[in-house]
């Protein structure tokens, strides 16, 4: 076994017991989290579950590093995606409109090109902010938009979104479960992809949205905060805007963000600019791999 001398606060011990998680962190040369913001968040009591002192120390020493996940462009790219009926790319976007029509037809919603189409592919849990969407989805209906949801999870959330679809059959549709091909079509055919998570270490859905020109609407947390730049007049002018971001985990904050998305939708040229800038972002594994190599080379 391990030497008894290792069982102390500067070793294996955590609250009188052996913690293998703490031990691994303590004795490692470096640890990685899946985004820079999450690496900061886990140094706080809210996220660290008693390890905030250790994690804060590691962060200060440069031994805790946040590196974002990457997107596999052989699977998730609108010009090669095997699951979508119409391929497209940045300089030729006609396929995106066709995918939108296919998606609307699949969900039996009006095939209206002018309707702002929101999509959400997720586990139906509180962490994913599903309750926030249920309480603010009427804003999408009020403004003539569409909402399509794919996912499964907590029974009361499944029931909640079913009730939304029953109440607004011309605007909201849902499929309970998971369907790989449909998830790709939703990312390709939507205009906005919703990721209103309460916490999100990295998140991949918003990265797929950027890749496909489906603007992410996200809460400012974890990897979502690192990957999506809010569309303000300043950021749009600076060509840095890539989506929509809200801060408070409340239905009111999400509702206001939805309103801002509709406002931008009414400005086609500005929308196209943001979409272009979103699609030009590089969140490939090439970029992530280079960051890992840089870290490993300095150990």
Residue ranges, per PLM feature:
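Catalytic cores of nucleotide-sugar-dependent glycosyltransferases that transfer UDP/GDP/TDP-activated
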Residues: 1-299
């Amino acid at each position: 076994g391990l030497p008894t001398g290792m069982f102390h606060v500067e070793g294996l011990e955590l609250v009188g017991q052996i913690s293998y998680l703490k031990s691994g962190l303590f004795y490692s040369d470096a640890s990685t989290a899946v985004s820079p913001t999450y690496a900061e968040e886990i140094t706080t009591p809210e996220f660290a579950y008693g390890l905030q002192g250790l994690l804060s120390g590691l962060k200060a020493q440069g031994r805790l590093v946040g590196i974002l996940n990457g997107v596999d462009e052989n699977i998730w790219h609108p010009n090669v995606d095997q699951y979508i009926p119409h391929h497209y790319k940045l300089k030729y976007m006609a396929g995106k409109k066709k995918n939108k029509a296919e998606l609307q037809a699949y969900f039996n919603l009006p095939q209206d090109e002018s309707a702002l189409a929101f999509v959400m592919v997720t586990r139906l849990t509180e962490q994913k902010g599903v309750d926030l969407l249920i309480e603010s989805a009427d804003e999408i209906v009020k403004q003539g938009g569409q909402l399509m949801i794919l996912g499964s999870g907590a029974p009361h959330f499944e029931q909640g979104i079913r009730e939304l679809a029953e109440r607004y059959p011309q605007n909201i549709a849902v499929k309970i479960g998971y369907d790989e091909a449909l998830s790709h079509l939703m990312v390709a055919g939507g205009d906005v992809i919703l990721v209103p998570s309460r916490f999100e270490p990295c998140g991949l859905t918003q990265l797929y949205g950027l890749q496909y020109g489906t603007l992410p609407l996200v809460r400012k947390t974890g990897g979502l905060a690192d990957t999506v730049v809010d569309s303000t007049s300043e950021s749009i002018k600076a060509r840095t805007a890539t989506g929509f971001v809200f801060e408070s985990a409340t239905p009111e904050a999400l509702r206001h963000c939805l309103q801002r998305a509709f406002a931008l939708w009414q400005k086609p040229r500005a929308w196209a600019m943001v979409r272009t800038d979103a699609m030009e972002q590089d969140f490939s594994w090439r970029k992530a791999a280079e960051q890992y190599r840089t870290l490993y080379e300095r150990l």
